[in-house]
Amino acid sequence: MDNNQIQELIISFLDDVSELSISGKDCNFSIKIVSKDFINLGTIDRHKIIMRLFTDLLQSGELHAISLDLKAPSEV
């Protein structure tokens, strides 16, 4: 899995992403997303939404660790 594949997965899932940055390599990534999809959601619910995208990859070992910074536009 590389940065472009992660980006494509996120963009295809969320309706409105105003900022997306991905850093890392191999199987460890840090992801920052600013999206209207996160309005009125708490931190845990935001993380659940994004982590669902990566469940299979984490279970298979293709991804090992993901650090998330998830915000609504009004929080930036």
Regions found by a protein language model. Name each.
Residues M1-V76:
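N-terminal, polar/charged subdomain of small-to-medium soluble alpha/beta proteins
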